[in-house]
């Protein structure tokens, strides 16, 4: 997951950036996750990769702030796609976690690109609130998520056909 979610975007950016800098206006969009701002039990490697991607996008946005390259970061919550295997779908159902249709995420991407130069956008309620709270009061989020830990562990032990996006 680190290679796909973090190393590949960094390497691709390194190759594309000289071309993008030749234009008056260009954009880089990094698609992260709510889990790039909130460490979630059962998804340590995935969260680490998305935390890294968010940090990379934030740093690059600041480094390129005096250029024509706009750096954006989109953080969807769970999205209903084929990338989610049965374990993730079942876990989300058990936790009552909403899963957005890809068209919702696409709409959020368009809104991100229409917004301020170089910005972040978090998708979904209450996830976007949790991201903000986690930034200033992480222990509060720890307490809120602690009640879900037994469910996460139960699903981690069950046998489901695995997918590459799952822990």
Annotate each language-model stretch with its function:
Residues 1-2:
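A hydrophobic alpha-helix adjacent to the NAD(P)-binding/active-site core of NAD(P)-dependent oxidoreductases
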Residues 13, 49:
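Active-site helix of classical SDR
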Residues 15-24:
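A short helix-coil junction within the Rossmann-fold of NAD(P)-dependent oxidoreductases
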Residues 18, 62-63:
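Alpha-helical segment proximal to the catalytic Tyr-Lys
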Residues 33:
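Residue(s) in the substrate-gating loop at a strand-loop-helix junction
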Residues 40-44:
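Active-site loop immediately N-terminal to the catalytic Tyr-X3-Lys motif
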Residues 73, 93-131:
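C-terminal helical subdomain
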């Amino acid at each position: 997951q680190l290679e796909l979610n973090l190393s590949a975007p960094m390497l691709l950016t390194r190759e594309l950036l000289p071309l993008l800098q030749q234009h008056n206006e260009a954009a880089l969009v990094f698609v992260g996750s709510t889990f790039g701002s909130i460490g979630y039990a059962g998804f340590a490697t995935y969260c680490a990769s998305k935390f890294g991607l968010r940090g990379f996008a934030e740093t690059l946005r600041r480094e390129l702030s005096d250029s024509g390259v706009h750096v954006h970061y989109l953080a969807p919550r769970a999205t209903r796609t084929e990338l989610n295997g049965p374990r993730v779908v079942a876990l989300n159902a058990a936790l009552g976690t909403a899963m957005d249709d890809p068209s919702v995420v696409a709409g959020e991407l368009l809104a991100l690109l229409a917004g301020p130069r170089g910005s972040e956008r978090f998708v979904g309620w209450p996830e976007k609130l949790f991201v903000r709270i986690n930034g200033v009061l992480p222990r509060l989020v720890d307490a809120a998520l602690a009640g879900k830990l037994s469910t996460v562990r139960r699903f981690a032990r069950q046998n489901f056909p695995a997918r590459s996006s799952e822990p």
